[in-house]
């Protein structure tokens, strides 16, 4: 039996694997419908997960690796199949699972008819594993030995890379841990990264439903909205306060104008000298003295009739027809109304302050004003003040 895999079979296996990978990557898989250990047919799991006891792939030894480093290897690894399986045609095992796509792009796991036992062999499983491994290693670049970083020069990259490849190799039977090296492409390409191989472990994984979103997220959003509303309210109030700034400035200007006007009025009142009504200011002294002399006063109009007729003697006849003078009724004097002298005293006090400059005369007028209790006395004091000012 041929122990090597033909190139056509390898290409078919790789193409089949790529189609399966694209199929599962293009369809969304939910957590509750994904494959788990419980959905695999008993007997297939040890083969699929690749237990170390059932691996039949023979890796090259140190001698083969040494020959490969010298250029004698062809890059194809050999496969050893147990003689019992080669002679008997393989052990019957269940076929791998089939996947069907249901409604909404959900992938569900189904089996063939349970009454019919599918046929297969470990050889087909081994071939599938080899194809999968080669397909993975196809995109993984082997680690290279570290080389000193040199300044990039055009045309020198290929020679440095060739020199690095010639230095590869392992001495002895130990496994090489590899080494890091700068990427061969110095034109700005992204550095390569090793592909993470799937972990082959027989421990089942617990599948559960993803936790729901946190309940407190709504409270946080409500707090943020409340803070935003309060901030907008404060901004509106600040805008209103700033809008009143012009009005405050206008009120200040008007208040300054009122103060200026009041000061002007107070100054004018301080310069006004309170004088008798009808007595003009700026009259010569001689003319004022002539006005105080005695002279005839003519009163126009009907005059006081009782005053003019009371002086004439009148005879009357009594009950005996004798002429007698009728006795005149006693003239009743009308009580003069009491006048408020407080206002006059205030006026005279102001006149003393403004018109009298001599302190002695001012003190004398103040004493007379304090003793005055009638209107005539106040009038005399006022006349004396006017004479002293002239």
UniProtKB/Swiss-Prot annotation:
Residues 54-98, 144-183 are annotated as: Disordered. The modification Phosphothreonine is found at residues 10, 16, 91, 150, 164, 249, 257, 281, 297, 374. Residues 342-390 are annotated as: Interaction with the nucleoprotein. Residues 54-65 have a biased composition (Polar residues). It holds the Pfam family Paramyx_P_V_C. The modification Phosphoserine is found at residues 69, 187, 256, 291, 293, 300, 373. The keyword Repressor does not apply. Keywords: Phosphoprotein, Viral RNA replication. Belongs to the rubulavirus/avulavirus P protein family. Homotetramer. Interacts (via multimerization domain) with polymerase L; this interaction forms the polymerase L-P complex. Interacts (via N-terminus) with N0 (via Ncore); this interaction allows P to chaperon N0 to avoid N polymerization before encapsidation. Interacts (via C-terminus) with N-RNA template; this interaction positions the polymerase on the template for both transcription and replication. Interacts with host RPS6KB1 kinase; this interaction may play a role in the viral replication and transcription. Essential cofactor of the RNA polymerase L that plays a central role in the transcription and replication by forming the polymerase complex with RNA polymerase L and recruiting L to the genomic N-RNA template for RNA synthesis. Also plays a central role in the encapsidation of nascent RNA chains by forming the encapsidation complex with the nucleocapsid protein N (N-P complex). Acts as a chaperone for newly synthesized free N protein, so-called N0, allowing encapsidation of nascent RNA chains during replication. The N-terminus consists of a long intrinsically disordered tail. The central part contains the coiled-coil multimerization domain (MD or OD). Forms a four-stranded coiled coil structure. The C-terminus constitutes the alpha-helical X domain (XD) that binds to the nucleocapsid (N-RNA complex) and the L polymerase. This is Phosphoprotein.
